[in-house]
From Swiss-Prot:
Disulfide bonds join 166-260, 238-252. Residues 49-108 form the Collagen-like domain. A carbohydrate binds at residues 196, 236, 240, 248-250. SUPFAM superfamilies: C-type lectin-like. InterPro entries: C-type_lectin-like, C-type_lectin-like/link_sf, C-type_lectin_CS, Ca-dependent_lectin, Collagen, Collectin_CTLD, CTDL_fold. This is Collectin-11. It holds the Pfam family Lectin_C. Homotrimer; disulfide-linked. Interacts with MASP1; probably triggers the lectin pathway of complement. PROSITE patterns: C_TYPE_LECTIN_1, C_TYPE_LECTIN_2. It comes from Bos taurus. Ca(2+) 2 binds at residues 228, 230, 236, 248-249.
């Protein structure tokens, strides 16, 4: 269409130029009007063109059906060893096993001689026990009850240092928890010629709440002197035993002798 319009314009221009120059149409311009022909036959199929650019991503399709279960895979590598579990509860005792075979016959016993030897050994043990008790009482200065042993340490120390000294010997500061033990300790320091010693009672953790050196609470027994404990000057958190058997709260930084206590099972 555009080509036809261009040819018609060219023909019109030639006519104008011819009129201006007063020349004949044949002399001025020779015009040929081209008319489009009929549509030709379809040509042969051309070669395959180059691949086009990728198109836009289409919309997400619907979720497909679940596929068939695959075959079991091979055994994988061993994983790392996990943490050790907590200890389980103790199991029930097993059934009693069958009796074992009888042993070989023993050597005939000469019982009369053995009984005599055992009797002599019992006498020696009794004698040695009495001698040991005498040595502990007379030489080492130890006092005993059925369950406890007490040692008077004639070294002046502050309360906490005295407690450490007793612990270093395998015991603790003495803790009289009944009248008998308290009377024994009072007689002990009287015989030693002392007026007072540290014992294992204090209220270091909470004022007025006296406990024993092993932190067990005091029960019903106590031997406080009249007007004690009074926490004079707000610094009396430790306890002394005087020769009369009474207790008095004193400052822990004072130095004095002290009594250690030991369990017989651990001596």
């Amino acid at each position: 269409m555009k080509r036809a319009l261009a040819l018609m314009g060219l023909a019109f221009l030639c006519v104008l130029r011819a009129g201006a120059a007063q020349q004949t149409v044949d002399d001025a311009c020779s015009v040929q009007i081209l008319v489009p022909g009929l549509k030709g036959d379809a040509g042969e199929k051309g070669d395959k063109g180059a691949p086009g650019r990728p198109g836009r991503v289409g919309p997400t399709g619907e979720k497909g059906d679940v596929g068939d279960k695959g075959q079991k895979g091979g055994v994988g590598r061993h994983g790392k060893i996990g943490p050790i579990g907590s200890k389980g509860e103790k199991g029930d005792s097993g059934d009693i096993g069958p009796p074992g075979p009888n042993g070989e016959p023993g050597i005939p016993c000469e019982c009369s001689q053995l009984r005599k030897a055992i009797g002599e050994m019992d006498n020696q043990v009794t004698q040695l026990t009495a001698e040991l008790k005498f040595i502990k009482n007379a030489v080492a200065g130890v006092r005993e009850t059925e369950q406890k042993m007490y040692l008077l340490v004639k070294e002046e120390k502050r309360y906490l240092d005295a407690q450490l000294a007793c612990q270093g010997r395998g015991g603790t500061l003495s803790m009289p928890k009944d009248e008998a033990a308290n009377a024994l300790l009072a007689a002990y320091i009287t015989q030693a010629g002392l007026a007072r010693v540290f014992i294992g009672i204090n209220d270091l953790e909470r004022e007025g709440a006296f406990v024993y050196a092993d932190r067990s609470p005091m029960q019903t027994f106590s031997k406080w002197r009249s007007g004690e404990p009074n926490n004079a000057y707000d610094e009396e958190d430790c306890v002394e035993l005087v020769a009369s058997g009474g207790w008095n709260d004193v400052a822990c930084h004072l130095t004095m002798h002290f009594l250690c206590e030991f369990d017989k099972e651990h001596v």
